[in-house]
Amino acid sequence: MNLRDISGNAFPELKELLLSEIGAIEIGGITADSRKAAPGSLFVAVAGTKADGAAYVKDAVAKGAVAVVSGHAVEADVPVLVVTDPRLYLSLAASRFYGKQPDTMVAVTGTAGKTSVASFVRQIWAFAGHAAAQIGTTGVIAPGREDYGALTTPDPVTLHALLAELASEGVTHAAMEASSHGLDQRRLDGVHLSAAGFTNLGRDHMDYHPTIEDYMAAKMRLFDTLMEKGAPAVIFADDPWSDKAIGAAREAGLEVRTVGRNGQYLTLKRVEHFRHKQMIEVHHDGVIFEVDIPLAGDFQVANALVAAGLAMSTGVPAATALKALEKLVGAAGRLELVGQTKNGALAYVDYAHKPDALENVLTSVRPFTSGRIITVFGCGGDRDKGKRPIMGEVATRLSDIVIVTDDNPRSEDAATIRSEVMAAAAGALEIGDRAEAIRHAVSMLSHGDTLIVAGKGHEEGQIVGSVTLPFSDHEQVRSALAELEGSKI
């Protein structure tokens, strides 16, 4: 493929240059990482938070890059294309270069619930007979493959290479998570979406976004920029930010489909909570559906409704989509039951690492907890510091016993992070060693108690400094339970 074809016509400033012999340069690959440049490749110099890719142009050219794209003029021994938005160029160019995508794709954004919704949509599609995949925080799951561990929204080159690979493998449907970072950094531009969803908005990524309004605006790029007019936007209607999402979708010319108690497309009329499931009554188009969802928590009902709405918006009949909800399997590390003691105390692992998510999890287990809620959690380093005391307050308000421990301290001092959480966690215990904190919590479990180990969920490593050490909350909980005679794992 030549440079003219890869560039397309989205950048008028390149028109004359691409009509010259420069446009005929053959491109054999595309990258924004100078270390991955190879003979015949196109290097796109993207400015990051810590470094500007333009500083590595010479390195990329030395490795064989035959052209460079930059946001400003740079010296190079190869043609340089200057564009207003290198990130956007990278995404659109990657989309053209790799070409193929699954025929039906949806993306979901929101502070919490993205992974579960993407997982549920995949499961509903599969139930309906489609070859379906999900892409997001827990990795890539598709027929015949489970690749765990990835960014919520992969970089554009990785993403489009993956989409082409999935399409070649026969995947026809794919559900993606759309993070605010990914949307703001143009990583999803060039993805052909059939429908999009919004779950909720709460405090997160305040180290990246200057205000909550900026955070919401980044989320809404999914509606106002990436979707074609008339496409369905499935919005959970019961969140404080739902009206703003509805307004953004309508202003973008999308077909709004709301779900939840205040929803018009899927109206939740009744919920009955049981220990490991919930019975819901949902109305759609004059028909009443009673559905047993095999998952606990109001937040899972919300996630299931958004997922059903997305599946229905991509051609799955309502009866099929809602029937599929009865077969759902929770996403890895999302209120996942790991085991129980011989006296019936339950031990869960959950990814909740934001105030709203932690509150949702703890309020969800209260109805079936006759004893105490014991919570083990910490906060990550090099991330939004403002949420640390908020999470400490949430944990102590909604738990009977709280143990504050280490999460992924990264480059920060772990003790300092814990102290910032403890400042608002009156009466909490502090045990820095996460494995020891989990063992101590398990040893305290009595009849009717519920243990929540929050923050890391599906992760299989703990980031200390620049090193990722092997660590799994699941394994630590199982190990601690194994030390208790008669526990079920």
From Swiss-Prot:
- Output the GO biological process annotations, alphabetical, semicolon-separated: cell division; cell wall organization; peptidoglycan biosynthetic process; regulation of cell shape
Q: Which InterPro entries match?
A: Mur-like_cat_sf, Mur_ligase_C, Mur_ligase_C_dom_sf, Mur_ligase_cen, Mur_ligase_N, MurE/MurF_N, UDP-N-AcMur-Glu-dNH2Pim_ligase
The keyword Cell cycle is annotated on this UniProt entry: yes
Q: Which residues carry this modification: N6-carboxylysine?
A: 219
Q: Does the keyword Amino-acid biosynthesis apply?
A: no
Identify the Pfam families for this entry: Mur_ligase, Mur_ligase_C, Mur_ligase_M
- Main location per the UniProt record: cytoplasm
| Coiled-coil annotated residue ranges, if any | none
GO MF annotations in UniProt: ATP binding; magnesium ion binding; UDP-N-acetylmuramoylalanyl-D-glutamate-2,6-diaminopimelate ligase activity
- Could you tell me what reaction this enzyme catalyses? UDP-N-acetyl-alpha-D-muramoyl-L-alanyl-D-glutamate + meso-2,6-diaminopimelate + ATP = UDP-N-acetyl-alpha-D-muramoyl-L-alanyl-gamma-D-glutamyl-meso-2,6-diaminopimelate + ADP + phosphate + H(+)
Question: Residues that bind UDP-N-acetyl-alpha-D-muramoyl-L-alanyl-D-glutamate, according to the entry?
Answer: 34, 152-153, 179, 185, 187
Known function: Catalyzes the addition of meso-diaminopimelic acid to the nucleotide precursor UDP-N-acetylmuramoyl-L-alanyl-D-glutamate (UMAG) in the biosynthesis of bacterial cell-wall peptidoglycan.
Name this polypeptide is given: UDP-N-acetylmuramoyl-L-alanyl-D-glutamate--2,6-diaminopimelate ligase
Per the UniProt record, the source organism is Agrobacterium fabrum (strain C58 / ATCC 33970) (Agrobacterium tumefaciens (strain C58))
List the top taxonomic levels of the source. Answer: Bacteria, Pseudomonadati, Pseudomonadota, Alphaproteobacteria, Hyphomicrobiales
State the gene name recorded for this protein: murE
